[in-house]
Design a protein with these regions (language model features):
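A polyampholytic, Gly/Pro-enriched intrinsically disordered region
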Residues: 19-26, 80-92, 154-166
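Structural signal for conserved beta-strand scaffold positions within catalytic alpha/beta enzyme cores
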Residues: 1-4, 63, 89-92, 112, ...
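General beta-strand structural signal in soluble alpha/beta enzymes
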Residues: 35-37, 63-66, 83, 112, ...
Length: 174
């Protein structure tokens, strides 16, 4: 099953419905189906949309947890994500700028996912909240073409970010 990487709701829904049709055709034949996903299937994953379409069809579904990108990054770099009483915010960079700003205003630590399109805005907001200096940005963690940037100012301006790009950041003044 191939899903379109678009923001158009109607196109996404068509893709989910097509996946449902294909998956149910195999399940109705008595076959087992595996739906592999990057990260955790219940965390910013296409899986959960297809799951909702299939969950009440009478077929048994077993969802096996995966490792989220930010946990993989923390372990991969030896970068503690959150400690003691710190408050962690997990934010998609695709959210409205005002929401991101409001969340980062109260968070001690942040995970910002899907930064590939809005990096400049995210960087500006992290700087505003004193979270940019020691932030790490990784694109395609654990893959052969992985890119790691420590301190967001160290990224070359012509860096092409991938959809699988995530920032981990900590507030310096707390």
């Amino acid at each position: 099953v191939v899903f379109p990487m678009v923001l158009d709701d109607a196109t996404q829904e068509e893709g989910w419905q097509e996946a449902k049709r294909i998956i149910l055709s195999y399940l109705d034949e008595g076959k087992s189906v595996v739906f592999l996903t990057l990260g955790d299937p219940m965390f910013y994953s296409t899986y959960m949309y297809v799951y909702r379409l299939i969950e009440n069809t009478g077929h048994e579904i077993e969802t096996i947890p995966g490792v989220t990108a930010f946990c993989a990054i923390g372990s991969h770099l030896g970068y503690p994500i959150v400690e003691k009483e710190e408050v962690l915010a997990i934010v998609p960079a695709t959210a409205p700028k005002e929401k991101i700003d409001a969340v980062l205003a109260v968070a001690d630590d942040a995970v910002i996912m899907k930064v590939y399109k809005n990096f400049d805005e995210v960087q500006e907001t992290l700087i505003k909240h004193n979270m940019a200096d020691d932030a790490v940005m990784i694109s395609r963690v654990g893959l052969p073409d992985e890119q790691v940037f420590v301190g967001l100012d160290n990224m070359p301006k012509d860096t092409k970010l991938n959809y699988l790009s995530t920032i981990l950041a900590k507030r310096k003044d707390r």
